[in-house]
Amino acid sequence: MNKALFLCLVVLCAAVVFAAEDLQKAKHAPFKRGAAGAAICICPDKVGRGDLWLFRGDCPGGYGYTSDCYVWPNICCYPH
């Protein structure tokens, strides 16, 4: 195998590894509806508005949510 082909193989393998790491980080990021701002939702027994999270069973941690209600198949998390 010549040196140029070996170098191309090394660069290709490194690119695959870095791309896989970025995809793994993106996979664990919570998916909130709307890129710039979240879609709002209103629960019948709550005052104000909440954040709508798509296809989740519970509210994600780290956002200060204290209560929720289900808007099937999504969840509405409070406080906003």
Swiss-Prot record:
Main localization of the protein described in the UniProt heading: secreted
Keywords associated with the record: Cleavage on pair of basic residues, Disulfide bond, Hypotensive agent, Ion channel impairing toxin, Nematocyst, Neurotoxin, Potassium channel impairing toxin, Secreted, Signal, Toxin, Voltage-gated potassium channel impairing toxin
Protein's UniProt keywords contain Disulfide bond: yes
One annotated Gene Ontology cellular component of this protein: extracellular region
Proregion positions: 20-31
InterPro entries assigned: BDS_K_chnl_tox, Myo_ane_neurotoxin_sf
Disulfide bonds: 41-76, 43-69, 59-77
GO biological process: regulation of blood pressure
Signal peptide as annotated in the record: 1-19
Gene Ontology molecular function, alphabetical: ion channel inhibitor activity; potassium channel regulator activity; toxin activity
Gene3D superfamilies listed in its UniProt record: Anthopleurin-A
Pfam families in UniProt: Defensin_4
UniProt similarity note: Belongs to the sea anemone type 3 (BDS) potassium channel toxin family.
Protein name per the record: Kappa-actitoxin-Avd4f
Organism of this sequence: Anemonia viridis
